């Protein structure tokens, strides 16, 4: 493994840096909007930051999506949905599999990241990605059962490009993915 690779199987030697005041303020504003949406719809938050330009597929042909989800039924469902939409879908359910996927020669174009994994905290994984030059710009959408305004704020402040709570509408998740990739 080269020094540019991440190793999620090891714990951090130093704490993850806290978000800046600007990141916290921006996340607070976005989370407030998402919280209003949650109250009006009663069950889900769907926030996605539109990119300034279309993100081209890394392989030049089709987008690759890494689904980090420990529920095999949901991971397979997302694999089917996004596969049918033309994405190459890769899956990981724990630290070791995340580690293997992000250290493959061709990075995914986008990651759907659950916060609550059996052996990892998705927010810590996101923070490590954002702190690493190779992965800092990798689009990441948090996909989680945590839908409180404070949860949304924490995800966005940590650098998530989007936040979709479970249970979600497939159309909302697809819209978030397309917005983050600049396809929508």
Question: Which role fits each region the language model picked out?
Answer:
Residues 1-66, 171-184:
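Non-catalytic signal-transmission and effector/linker regions of two-component phosphorelay proteins
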Residues 69:
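Conserved acidic carboxylate
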Residues 76-84:
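Charged docking surfaces used in two-component/phosphorelay signaling
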Residues 91-110:
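Acidic, metal-coordinating helix/loop segments flanking the phosphotransfer/catalytic sites
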Residues 118, 148:
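The feature encodes the CheY-like receiver
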């Amino acid at each position: 493994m080269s020094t540019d690779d991440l190793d999620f199987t090891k714990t951090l030697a130093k704490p993850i840096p806290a978000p800046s005041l600007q990141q916290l303020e921006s996340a607070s504003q976005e989370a407030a909007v998402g919280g209003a949406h949650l109250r009006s719809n009663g069950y889900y938050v769907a926030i996605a930051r539109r990119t300034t330009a279309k993100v081209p597929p890394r392989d030049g042909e089709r987008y690759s999506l890494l689904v980090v989800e420990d529920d095999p039924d949901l991971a397979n469902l997302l694999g089917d949905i996004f596969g049918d939409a033309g994405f190459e879908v890769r899956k990981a359910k724990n630290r070791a599999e995340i580690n293997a996927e992000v250290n493959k020669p061709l990075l995914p174009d986008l990651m759907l990241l659950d916060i609550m994994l059996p052996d990892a905290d998705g927010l810590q994984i996101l923070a490590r990605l954002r702190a690493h030059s190779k992965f800092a710009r990798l689009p990441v959408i948090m996909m989680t059962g945590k839908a409180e305004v404070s949860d949304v704020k924490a995800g966005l402040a940590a650098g998530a490009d989007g936040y979709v709570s479970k249970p979600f509408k497939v159309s909302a998740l697809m819209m978030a993915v397309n917005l983050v990739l600049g396809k929508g």
